[in-house]
């Protein structure tokens, strides 16, 4: 390439970079104008604030120079030491430097711009580089690295990549700082696969061995490789690629990269979220072997997983190990333990932990009390739950929606409806769970119309009723034999975009069958089968039972036989309703065949199975078979129910059975 063509090429690249920076600044100015308009037209008076603010994605806008706390800084430049008492002074001197070209070079400009980078003003730094470009002050690799970092900090990754392309076109060799900055930018944008590919390239080409550049990176405000590496590891774990993250850590340890407690903590947390507690514990042991001291975050993550899995003894052992090693548990650690104990009904152990944390002067928070209150309510200890609420208020910890919901549920369970309603009225912002709890109470009391009023209140408050809300009300209407209202509500549910689930379908199917509306039930059943809702065994049991009650035993048998085609496994209840159907039409031989098939398929008959079949045999006059079944029933620990005993008593009264038969049932 000739000198003229080289100059032309550099000029084209230079012009392109200026255009990119101008685009970024124009976008910035538009963002600022919009924000200023919204805030009442606030203007920034200093002429230096022409340097645009690049809007940060998902963050607050950058502060003005007058808002930044700057305590002054001294720089050694070509002309000697210069002290800047304010950022405005630094901009003044920078303007003087670019006018004094070629006395001041990119090295001096970079030092001044570094002040703004360290003060978290990448927007100003970008604008100052624009001035350098306009004045034809050549940028060096150090300049490009700062510029790439500034674009990344402003979440303008496309500009960072464009700048990277331009520096390579100008013949500069990207270094570890360049790659590390881009890697960090990709991680910030959640472009983990691309970051992983770039990191792999860095490993292969030996860039990660240039650790001597760490000082330079810190000087201009860049993060060292290990911190960016942690960002990458965190990204992999967030995507569920924990095994890849662990393999990458092992690889980098082999290459001599120092892995800190943050890296291990990220991997341990990822493993725990996957439920792989064994690997997390192995990694904990490995940390100790490499003399990296685990912190409370790592211990808490493992303890939390152990508690969730019900391994409370292991969690307690690890908790004790923490204390022995001088690692102080925090409120999160205690909350994990308390919540774990509460979830498995170990309320007294949870109470003991609460006392322990208070003795250690670790203040419980609302999550601590919520776990204990919820457990108290589930255990039926409403008085203890009320005492815990009082303790919360005494400690100036204000109840949240979860607290109120637990207490309302507890009051409802103990039929203290007035207290539940009073607490509901106290809530500033009840959620849909709160409404569902109160609606359920109304429906159980057969006050479904009042439950419907609460459904309308949900909409008025800007909340959205969910599947549970509609299921509760539909069930309520079915219970009061108002199937038309139940159907109307079902249609409303669909029209409002709330998806019915298997429970919704089962409620309606049961309502139709119980009210002898078999045709409507079968019609709905057919519609559901064509939908995306997966019917469960309960749904088929309801329909088979409805068919048998409606004298459609043969059709019920056909449906029973088709269950494997639908991917449904019959349970004891399925066999019971079918056996009952056969007995109802006096098909005792079919009932007996199904009874034996039931046992062959691994389903043990229950009390209902035996009593149904015994009554069927007695009705058909098969006394010997009924005696055989009674003997088997008693040997399996079951006994005659009220219907069987009454039937036997009637047969004895009519003289069709011997009195000794009654003794066999007792």
From Swiss-Prot:
Pfam families: PPR_1 (PF12854), PPR_2 (PF13041). Coiled coil: none annotated. PPR repeats lie at residues 105-139, 140-174, 175-209, 225-259, 260-294, 295-329, 330-364, 365-399, 400-430, 431-465, 466-500, 501-535, 536-570, 571-605, 606-640. Keywords: Repeat. Belongs to the PPR family. P subfamily. NCBIfam families: PPR. This is Pentatricopeptide repeat-containing protein At1g64100. The lineage of its organism: Eukaryota, Viridiplantae, Streptophyta, Embryophyta, Tracheophyta.
